[in-house]
Amino acid sequence: MEPIYRPPPTSGRAVHVFDMEREAWRGTPSPGFWMKPVRHDDQQGLFLGLIRFERGTRSGIHQHQGIATSFVADGSLTDYNGPVNLHEVGINYLGSTHDAVAYRDTILVSRLEAVVTYPPEGEITGVHAGSQHASVRNLEPDRPPEINVAIDSLPKQPTGIEGVLRQLIFDYEGTGTNHRMVQLWVRPETAFEFEAGALTEFWVRGGLASFNDQPVHADCFVICEAGARVKVRSPYGVLLLAWAEGRESGAGNLFGF
């Protein structure tokens, strides 16, 4: 599937804003699955964007070969471990094996960081970038297939920047990568700056702000390439989900490295 954004071979140190309200839902080869892909790389299984399940749609049995994080913006998904509910983040890890069903129309804000495998006898559905057939066996049957996090109940932590609080959703411990996923609460009349130490991405959950004078609102993605100098202004407050692949340089510690 053709994405909206393709990362350059070397960082251009740019900041890109994508207004998903302006993007049409794109059908996949599997009925009932729709996407708005910001990034979509089938070779590496990398994805950033929105995924929509129509009511009654199943993902099919599959196994994650790395981290996938999904915020439930609307609806819910259920597998053998139970549901991931509205406004929770479901975290899949290397070896997560499950079949998820939507009992209601569901929208996910998703970031995939590795390919997903389906058993040879199974159908590959259109829900995952980098899907391929391979032998699938759950080698850790006592481990749940996902970690479900009620992110709004997490403690708020200071970031060292006045007007910005952090809720640490996932620190990637034990995954072999040193990334972070957080929620940032930005108070009205707040302004701050940082330099992205590595790829850093945001989804605007609510409120208004600007990134390098580019206005953003609810359901916008922001991609900050490595080395980008980023100026954030929020006169009215903003709530952000963020994924950082490395620590930023700046006055504080936004992402909890």
Question: What is each model feature region?
Answer:
Residues F33, P83, L94-G122, A198, ...:
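Ligand-binding loop in jelly-roll beta-barrel domains
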Residues E54-R55, H64-D79, P188-N212:
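Glycine- and acidic-residue-biased ligand/ion/polar-headgroup-sensing regions
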Residues T57-G60, T78-D79, L86, G90-D99, ...:
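Histidine-centered metal-chelating micro-motifs
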Residues I169, L184, V216, V222, ...:
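Fold-core signature of tandem repeat domains
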Residues M1-Q44, E121-G176:
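A short, N-terminal "cap"/entry segment at the start of jelly-roll beta-barrel domains
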